[in-house]
Each structure stands twice: as structure tokens, then as C-alpha cells.
Amino acid sequence: MNKTAILVGTGKAALLAGLCFSALLANAATVSVDCDAGNTIMAALGSVKPGDTVLVSGTCKEQVTIAPEVVRITLDGQKKTTIQHPGGPAASPHALYNRGKEIIIKGFTVTGGLDGIHLSGPASALIDGNVVVKNTGRGIHIDKGSVARILNTTVEQSGGIGIDVTGASYAYIGVFIPRVPALAPNTIRNNGGPGINIERTSGAWIVGNTISNNKESGIAVHRNSQADVIANVINANGGDAITVSHNGGVNLSSETRRDGPNQTAAGQNNGGAGIKCMIGGYVDGPIGTLTGAKGAKDFDKSCVDRTAAP
């Protein structure tokens, strides 16, 4: 086949793809749900198609489950909608249980579940501009190979972990794509366990967030997991600012980011160390001003220490 034929074929393929995408957008629908009028999100989810938006208002006292076959939809709470788990027997103990893919969840207060937002699957979601508050277990939980982008969201007053990433999953916390400079910082505070927990062969970018007053460490990375932890403010947590253990690893800088080191504000020391490393972990990069009651660092002999001054 000559070059002209290849170019013509490529052009036709691109045109066809563009037409298909335009058709998808043209067919996208907006479904309005007023929970105060007796409508439910679950009823709307029964008929949505890829590209649709479910526009929600009111207080929705229901358990919301997004099925695995649901893809590329938006749930928009318009910053004025609450999803509140009703308690008692329900399809799931979690307020919002997502098994779908490429789901956008934005503008909600999510409360009253075992977990506030739970991804399992593998599932994928963009969680943007929400308040996840007063859930008895974890605020946001991501497992079984799921991927989440968590942006502009407050996670607070969970009974346990604030944001939990486990089971070969991945999370972008505070940044949409590592190479894009813009930050979308989250606030993770006043949770009953670590602010952020990364474990069991999982990974994360954790950039530009405020992580404070959690009962245990600000960030915990362990059990063969890895995280890039950059430009966060980590204050007044009950444990360390960052704990690394059990063959976990933390990079405190990256070629793709220029946001500066992590910080602990003056007078807001963490209860443990700035960084604690044990049982075969590693830490690489500038410590910044991370500190705690036990000083900036607490490493055992099994850890690889490649930390540096800012």
C-alpha cells in the first residue's frame, strides 16, 4: 500500500471517529432528579446511557449503587445535594457504591454510610468538589484494581481512614494528571485513622493537599505500595506526618512536578515523626519542613534513606 492510500485511510478513520463522538454528544441527555419531591437517583440510573448527566437536588435519603455496566455518566449534585445512607437493610452499607467506569461524581455531600464513596470492581471515577463527612468506616475507599481522581474534595470525620487505596488500585489525590501543573487540592481532616492510606500493591500521586488532625498518621504507605507525595501541608496528626513500612516507598519529589516540598506549619507538629520508615521501606527526596514530636525523621536500619534538606 502506498503512502497516499495510508493517509487517505487514516483520514477516513479519524473522520469516522469524530462523527461517532459527535453523535454520542448529540444523544447525551440530562435527567433531573429532585429528591425533595420524591424522585430518586437509583430510578434515574436505570435508564441512563453513556454521556448522560443526572442533575440532582435536595436531600436524597437512599443508598446509591452504580452497576458495572454503567459507563461515562455524570452525577452532578450542583453543590447543594446530600446523599444520606438511609440505614438499616440496603443494597450496600456504603452511601455511594460505584462499580461503573469513567463516572463523574461532583457537587455532593455524602454521609451516613459505612464508607461514603466506595469504588470496587475494577471501577473508575472522577470525584470532584464533594464533601464526604461522618461516615462510620472510611470516607473514600478504592479497591480491586480501581482508579480514582479525587479533586477539590473535603473528607472529614470518618470513623476510620479518610481516603483508603488498596488491592492494586491507583489514586490521583489533588492532581488530575501529574504533568499538568494545575492543582485541585483536597482537605482531609479529623478522621479516626490515617488521613490517607495506600496499601497492598497500590499507588498514588498525593499533591497539594491539606492533611490535618487525623487520629493516626497523615499519610501511610505500606505493603508493597508506592506514592509520590509532594507539596502537601501535613499538620497536627496523631501519628507521623508520613509513615512508610512493609516494603512501601515514598518519593518526595518528581521530575514532572515543581510544586516544592511538603510542610508542617509552625506550632502544628504531628504526634510522631515528620517521616517514619520501617520494615524495608524507602524514602527519597527533600523532607521540607515535615516534623513532629519525635523530630523530622525516625528510620530503622532496614529502610533506604535518600532524604535530603529542602
What are these regions (language model features)?
Residues T30-S57, K61-T65, D305:
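Acidic Gly/Asp/Thr-rich repetitive segments characteristic of extracellular carbohydrate-active
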Residues F108, N130, N135, T153, ...:
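Consensus "Asn ladder" position of solenoid repeat domains
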Residues P86-Y97, G112-L119, K134-I142, Q157-V175, ...:
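Extracellular beta-strand/beta-solenoid scaffold signature
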Residues K12-A23:
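Bacterial N-terminal signal peptides
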Residues L24-A28:
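Sec/Tat signal peptide C-region and signal peptidase I cleavage site
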Residues M1-G9:
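N-terminal secretory signal peptides that target proteins for export/translocation
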